[in-house]
Structures are given as C-alpha cells and as structure tokens.
Amino acid sequence: MTPYSLLRPLIFRIPAEPAHRLTIKALGLAQGGTTLAPTPSLAQRIAGLAFPNPVGMAPGFDKNAEVPDAMLGLGFGFVEVGTVTPRPQEGNPKPRLFRLVEDRAVINRMGFNNEGAQAVTNRLVRRRETGKHGLPGIVGVNIGANKDSADRIADYALMTRLMAPLASYLTVNISSPNTPGLRALQDEGALAALLDAVIEARGNMTTPVFLKLAPDLEPADIDSICRIAIEKQLAALIISNTTITRPVLRSAHAGEAGGLSGAPLRELALQRLRDFRKASGGAIPLVGVGGIATVDDAWERIRAGASLIQIYSAMVYEGPGLARRLVAGLERKVREAGLTSIAEAVGSE
C-alpha cells in the first residue's frame, strides 16, 4: 500500500478534469525538483538522444508544457508535452474525461484542448533561457492540427517550424480519435504527403521526428506505415494511442464516446506493437504505450520490441511514485536476466 492509495478515494470524489487541473497546479509548485540519476543498465541512446531510463510520461498530461521538470523529478526518463496546435482551442464540450474505476481505465474526448503554440513556445523558451526550470532532461513536444483547420498538413508544418528548435523531439500525432477526420492522415497517400511537409519544414534542424499511431489499424495499414516511416527516415513510431473499440467494461461510464486507455487497452496495444515490430523488421525504434501499469507490463512491452515506454492512465490509479517503481523494477529485471543493458532485451521474446 502506498500513500497515494490512501488518498485516492478522496481524489476520486473530485471530477476527473478538475482533479487533473489541481494536480498540474500542485506540480507547478514542485518545478525544479531533483531528477533521477541515469541508471547505467537502463540508459540508451535512441534517435541521437541519451535517455537515462526508458520510462516516459505520455502526452495529454502536461498539455501546455507547464510542469515538465516536475515530471522529470518524479523519475521519468523523458516527458512528452502536448498535444499542441497552432492556435489555442477549447476542445470538446465538458464533461469529456471519465474514470472507469472498476476497469482501471479512462475514456477521454478532450479534443486537443490547449493554449496554443505561442503559449507553449514562451514556456519552453523561458525554460531554456532563464534556467529557472532548466534541469537537464528530454522534453518532447506532441504536435497536432486545429479542429477547424482548412489545411491540416499546413498546421503540422507550421508546428514543426515553431517547435523543432525547442523540443528534444517532435511527435506527429495523427491518431487521436477525438478530432474528426484526423486518423485519415494515417492513410498511405496522406501520410507520405504529411511527412514530406514536416521534414521540409524541419529544414536543417536535426530534431528527431516520431509518429504516433492508433491501435485500430488493419494489417495492410501497418505494412504501408512502416514502409513510409522507414523511407522518410523517421526516428521512432509510438504504438499506440487510445482505442475506439470497446472490450467488455464494467464501469458506469463504459458507454461514453472517446478514446479508451488504461488496462483494457493493454492487450491490443501489445499486439499492435508486435505487429509493427514484425512489419518493420526492427528497422525503426518503437515506443510502447497503452495499459502499462506494472513492472511486468513494462518488461513485456520491452521484450515485444519497445525501446521506450510511456505511461499516463496508470498514474491515475497508481499515483506519482509509479515511474520510480517501474525504473527500479526494470533495473531488477535486467539484472535477473543476466543482461548488462536493457537494449539487449528489446524484441527478445
């Protein structure tokens, strides 16, 4: 039992979105805390970046880059902020975030609510230039298009030009189910055109580009995405976003529209990771996301082909100490397997 498990019933009396906002405000008071020292057996160099451990904070938690250093201070090896769009947008009508407690899951239909590129740029510039929150650490930026955009590819190109100078890496998010038509950019022709625009917009900058994908894909889609990603020399694929499918759920909010994350996504996300590992032949690094809540979950995802992992929904149920527990557990798994580096375990199942 952890201190968080004692507090959780009280926290869950607050609706999900206001509780999240209170959490961000509380973490803002902790900005500048101590980061977790690199763990030699867990450290990896991927896409030219030195990850101190493979456990990352998924986007959606810190949408506006308000608390990246506080999250690094919780033990994360990297943090991904966003999704950020060119212009501020309110997102979908509330309520739009639901805890499914009996299923240890979350349904969201947030709709890329964020303060926009200018606000996030200001925070990242301040972080870099003032040193006030200038802790070392990998902070990626997840970029998206405005819902009412007349040219979504142009939005991604603009976001690339704005964020590439400030981000450790960029993630092109075309897999949210909560922006109508967005997932169509995963189609072969649209994806190639999008990535060409992003790469052109990046210009001479070397910021790695990741691509975040949906779990609700057909085998032919997976093959074409891998081919294009390798051809365009993307740095990594993130598998996966939330799902619009609905396994058997017990919670009262099970029928809510939106993307499902947490424990019910685990098997689907794991299978899609394996599918992408097979289709890519290991030619591109993979980031495993979806339903990871325990050390065994994390280790399984690594052995299935993920070089890195990300968590979010599990934090709702397990609390802020989860990242450090996963890091300690993965270090133990590497040692028990007789390995010197977690990189040796990637894809070893």
Curated annotation (Swiss-Prot):
Catalytic residue positions: S176 (nucleophile)
Taxonomic lineage from the root: Bacteria, Pseudomonadati, Pseudomonadota, Alphaproteobacteria, Sphingomonadales
Cellular localisation: Cell membrane
Binding site for substrate: K63, N108, R109, M110, G111, F112, N173, N178, N241, T242
A cellular-component GO term for this protein: cytoplasm
Amino-acid positions noted as binding FMN in the UniProt annotation, renumbered to this chain: P59, G60, F61, D62, K63, T83, N142, N173, K212, S240, G262, G291, Y312, S313
Membrane topology of the entry: Peripheral membrane protein
GO biological process: 'de novo' pyrimidine nucleobase biosynthetic process; 'de novo' UMP biosynthetic process
InterPro entries associated with the record: Aldolase_TIM, DHO_dehydrogenase, Dihydroorotate_DH_1_2, Dihydroorotate_DH_2, Dihydroorotate_DH_cat, Dihydroorotate_DH_CS
Pathway given in the UniProt record: Pyrimidine metabolism; UMP biosynthesis via de novo pathway; orotate from (S)-dihydroorotate (quinone route): step 1/1
Keyword Oxidoreductase: yes
Description of how the protein assembles with itself and partners: Monomer.
Keywords annotated in UniProt: Cell membrane, Flavoprotein, FMN, Membrane, Oxidoreductase, Pyrimidine biosynthesis
Annotated protein name in UniProt: Dihydroorotate dehydrogenase (quinone)
Organism of this sequence: Novosphingobium aromaticivorans (strain ATCC 700278 / DSM 12444 / CCUG 56034 / CIP 105152 / NBRC 16084 / F199)
Pfam families per UniProt: DHO_dh
Cofactor(s) required for function per UniProt: FMN
Superkingdom classification of source: Bacteria
Single annotated GO MF: dihydroorotate dehydrogenase (quinone) activity
EC numbers, comma separated: 1.3.5.2
